[in-house]
């Protein structure tokens, strides 16, 4: 059956497969022969085979953990019949002797060899195995009942590990492992089914040929379309693993030849056929060109033809790179990703040079006007997307170095760093040296390494040899960078303009300088900077009538700060930046110092009622190191002026155990009771430790000093209440917001002249079934010293004392009525109205569990002790209804230390609720899984 396979190639592996798919498409039986060569330079005593279907076989595999990081728990909660697993496996050597394996569930099968396999020699392995295919909803591969998508299920050698010693688990990252192999695959499939794949089809259900990527097959009840193209006399067929709408197919028949011709000019050659699966299309399409839908309204950014063009250029580009370039994705992901983005940039320059990032959306009229025209975002070019994505993540200090191993790259950095930043740097080099020479280097490198595993450092070396100004790239890719070019000043000397450019790096990086006259005439100069020299002086003729000078316009280079790249040579703002007032938060325009002035209307509490005011701040959609915000308001409840203000500065070292160190000063003036105001002044510092952007773990240390002044009522004055007090606090916080086991811990100490206390709080939430959770909170508080005059600073049992004005309470001083029923999970955390406060120590536990849909049960128990009184045990229980989880929830007490509460006449007054109106919390919850 397998005769002649070894004759295909002297040094290339061969795999022969006969695969039979069951009628329900859930089981696959495979008879297989592998001719494996020792590609290392040493004797092999074991051969490793990848058994990646076992990545789907249980909880706890690397694949399950990665999916949970992506906020996807489908595989974790999968039923047994949805999992993938190896059911049987028999492996024999060329002497028909069975080779033992450790376990069918292992993703890496290490086979002991009877005799050492010398370098260059081959071994023939006979395999017979049967597997259960996983559900396609987990990774896009497996079975859906209607179709089977086969990729990474055949047992194959790992060509990136010629020594056969390192484990490589499946992470669903589209990595090639069985490249440079001759495949023969014959299928036995259910009746009325069709099979398509990325191997040349030699007859019905049979495929044969070389692949530098992994084989992929689609077996379904439908025969999907294909489009044949003739490019410079060569026929290229593009096959699809999904249906095309008539309009989409018509558009593709027009655009695919353009794409393929463009790519052939840049890369030199094209494969004879291209297979695009539904999963590949979804992964590699153009990010950010989808229509915006809101309720029943749909706002298109681009026409259907433009979307097809943009989507499929990226899809086709990446598919061709995957088929023609052999790269270890774990280590060298940036090469193909960067080339894809570079080629996209070249395509956009040619066909979408002036197209805006928001497409035709700014032309949308609402009540006869075009409101988006007021935003700078409406003027940003589509080409700017590459630099903007890097800016967005870098300014949060959540970027990663370009050559970071792919498994630890966050999903957003896969796009923003591996693809966009690398592509921008390639484009930067191409603009400096000329696109023709750069494209020749790319074409020659890809052609030279056809059929071989690439070493991208060699590409960078070739680039540096042809263009010395690109020599910085090798080091640049190995670290997080914060390069900043700055226009220091412009001065006129005789008949020339002297321009001083500063950089914050010793590397020799060129900079693009652009001049512009008042009439809009532009000139471009490339300035080479010297190594170890941070100041560069440029002299330009004064006769050029230069009005404005710009460095690296259009976010062409990944800088840490574009705000110092613009200067005016003439006028009132010469050697300075102009100020621009804006009404609504926007993508920042680095040419201006922007101040956002926006009206504010919000409900504060029952005393201030609605606050009417205006907010002045410099915070755009992107983070900044220096931030200020001032919000004067008019309190409709008191008829007085109120407000708040804050100033902060953050230090964000690129390579450090610290992610950010922020210092801030703030102040506020509002009301906490009828006719009673408070004034608060704060000095605070927060240190956030560095986090792996894929990780859900965050750690921080915070310290603050707060000064308070409160107006007092006559009764409070008579009771010698506190009108002025100072609070010092120091705390440590740890949180892990992973999907199944969420946990957090906080430790803090707080004090003033009359007391010192320490507090600890732990929280754990377990998702034991889809959307069903059990949470446990532990709280402990202890006064080291307590000489206070009243219970203001005591620990609360069922109500918190908001003496620091840090909780959002609708009725700050309410003791009855609906406002007093607001619940804040703090201190003791009891939901029933258990009387009293605690002035010595308290411990409590709060338990909450799902029972059905939005209904939960809760129980609280604890022990507390007040001075000169014995310790007391308290408890409560009840039903919680999660109307909007974590934001609006209602508590119905049932049984507690007080008795059976529904029997009380005032039961309606005992119902509690939480109401969280925090947009930041919503945003943080939404972005989980991206970074």
Q: What do these predicted ranges mean?
A:
Residues 71-89, 102, 107, 126-218:
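Extended, low-hydrophobicity, Ser/Thr/Pro/Gly-biased non-transmembrane segments
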Residues 185, 225-347, 559:
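Juxtacatalytic substrate-recognition/specificity segment
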Residues 196, 274-275, 437-438, 465, ...:
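Beta-strand-rich binding/interaction modules
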Residues 271, 404-492:
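Amphipathic alpha-helical substructures
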Residues 335-424:
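Acidic/His/Gly-enriched intrinsically disordered linker/tail segments
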Residues 511, 519, 523, 527-529, ...:
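Outer-membrane beta-barrel initiation region
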Residues 881, 885-887, 908-931:
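Outer-membrane beta-barrel "beta-signal"
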């Amino acid at each position: 059956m397998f005769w002649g396979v070894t004759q295909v190639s002297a040094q290339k592996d061969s795999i022969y497969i006969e695969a039979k798919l069951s009628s329900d498409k859930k089981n696959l039986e495979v008879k297989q022969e592998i001719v494996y060569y020792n590609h290392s330079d040493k004797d092999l005593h074991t051969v490793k085979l990848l058994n990646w279907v076992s990545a789907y076989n249980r909880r706890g595999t690397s694949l399950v953990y990665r999916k949970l990081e992506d906020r996807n728990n489908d595989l974790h909660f999968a039923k047994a019949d949805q999992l993938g697993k190896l059911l049987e496996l028999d492996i024999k050597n060329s002497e028909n002797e069975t080779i033992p394996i450790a376990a069918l569930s292992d993703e890496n099968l290490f086979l002991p060899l009877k005799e050492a396999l010398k370098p260059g020699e081959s071994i023939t392995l006979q395999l017979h195995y049967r597997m259960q295919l996983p559900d396609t909803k987990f990774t896009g591969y497996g079975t859906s009942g209607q179709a089977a998508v086969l990729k990474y299920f055949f047992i194959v050698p790992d060509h990136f590990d010629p020594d056969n010693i390192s484990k490589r688990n499946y992470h669903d990252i589209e990595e090639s492992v069985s490249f440079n192999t001759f495949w023969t695959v014959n299928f036995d499939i259910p009746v009325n089914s069709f099979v398509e794949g990325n191997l040349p089809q030699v007859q019905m259900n049979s495929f044969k040929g070389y692949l530098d990527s992994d084989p992929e097959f689609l077996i379904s009840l439908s025969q999907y379309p294909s489009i044949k193209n003739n490019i410079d006399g060569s026929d290229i067929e593009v096959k699809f693993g999904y249906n095309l709408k008539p309009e989409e197919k018509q558009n593709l028949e027009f655009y695919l030849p353009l794409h393929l011709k463009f790519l052939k000019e840049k890369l030199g050659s094209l494969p004879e056929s291209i297979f695009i699966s539904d999963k590949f299309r979804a992964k590699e399409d153009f990010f950010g060109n989808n229509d915006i839908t809101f309720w029943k309204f749909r706002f298109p950014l681009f026409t259907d033809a433009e979307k097809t063009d943009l989507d499929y250029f990226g899809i086709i580009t990446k598919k061709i790179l995957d088929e023609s370039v052999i790269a270890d994705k774990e280590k060298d992901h940036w090469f193909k990703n960067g080339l894809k983005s570079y080629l996209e940039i070249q395509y956009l320059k040619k066909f979408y040079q002036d197209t805006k990032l928001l497409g035709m959306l700014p032309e949308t009229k609402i009540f006869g006007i075009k409101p988006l025209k007021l935003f700078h975002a409406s003027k940003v070019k589509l080409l700017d997307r590459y630099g903007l994505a890097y800016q967005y993540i870098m300014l949060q200090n959540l970027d990663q170095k370009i050559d970071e191993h792919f498994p630890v790259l966050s999903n957003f950095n896969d796009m923003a760093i591996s693809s966009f930043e690398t592509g921008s740097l390639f484009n930067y080099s191409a603009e400096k040296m000329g696109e023709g020479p750069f494209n020749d280097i790319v074409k020659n490198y890809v052609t030279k390494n056809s059929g071989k595993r690439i070493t991208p450092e060699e590409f960078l070396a070739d680039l540096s040899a042809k263009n010395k100004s690109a020599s910085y790239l090798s080091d640049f890719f190995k670290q997080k960078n914060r390069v900043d070019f700055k226009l220091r000043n412009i001065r006129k000397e005789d008949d020339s303009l002297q321009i001083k450019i500063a950089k914050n790096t010793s590397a020799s990086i060129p900079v693009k300088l652009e001049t512009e006259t008042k009439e809009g005439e532009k000139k471009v100069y490339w300035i080479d900077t010297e190594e170890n020299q941070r100041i560069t002086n440029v002299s330009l003729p004064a006769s050029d009538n230069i009005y404005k000078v710009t460095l690296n316009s259009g976010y062409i280079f990944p800088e840490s700060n574009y705000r110092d790249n613009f200067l005016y040579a003439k006028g009132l703002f010469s050697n300075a930046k102009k100020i621009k007032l804006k009404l609504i938060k926007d993508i920042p325009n680095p040419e201006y110092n922007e101040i956002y002035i926006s009206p504010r209307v919000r409900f504060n509490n029952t005393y201030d009622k609605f606050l009417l005011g205006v907010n002045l701040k410099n915070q755009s959609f992107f983070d900044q190191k220096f931030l200020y915000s001032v919000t004067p308001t008019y309190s409709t409840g008191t008829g007085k002026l109120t407000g708040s203000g804050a100033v902060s500065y953050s230090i964000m070292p690129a390579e450090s155990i610290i992610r950010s160190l922020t210092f801030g000063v703030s102040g506020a003036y509002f009301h906490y009771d009828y006719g009673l105001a408070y004034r608060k002044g704060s000095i605070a510092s927060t240190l956030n430790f560095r986090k792996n952007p894929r990780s859900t773990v965050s750690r921080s240390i915070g310290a603050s000093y707060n000064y308070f002044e409160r107006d007092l009522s006559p009764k409070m004055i008579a009771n010698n209440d506190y009108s002025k007090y100072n609070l010092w606090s120091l705390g440590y916080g740890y949180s892990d917001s992973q999907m199944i086991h969420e946990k957090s811990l906080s430790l803090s100490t707080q004090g003033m002249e009359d007391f010192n206390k320490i507090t600890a709080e732990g929280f754990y939430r377990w998702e034991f079934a889809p959307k069903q959770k059990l949470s446990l909170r532990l709280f402990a508080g202890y006064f080291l010293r307590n000489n206070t005059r009243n219970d203001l600073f005591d620990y609360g049992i069922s109500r918190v004392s908001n003496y620091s004005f840090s909780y959002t309470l609708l009725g700050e001083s309410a003791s009855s009525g609906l406002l007093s029923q607001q619940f804040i999970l703090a201190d003791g955390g009891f939901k029933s109205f258990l009387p009293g406060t605690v002035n010595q120590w308290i411990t409590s536990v709060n338990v909450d569990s799902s029972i059905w849909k939005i209904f939960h049960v809760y129980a609280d128990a604890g022990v507390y002790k007040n001075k000169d009184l014995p310790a007391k045990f308290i408890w409560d229980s009840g039903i919680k209804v999660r109307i909007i989880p974590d934001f609006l929830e209602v508590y119905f007490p049932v049984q507690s230390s007080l008795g059976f509460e529904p029997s009380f006449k005032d039961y309606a007054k005992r119902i509690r609720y939480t109401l969280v109106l925090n947009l930041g919390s919503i945003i943080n919850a939404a972005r989980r899984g991206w970074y």
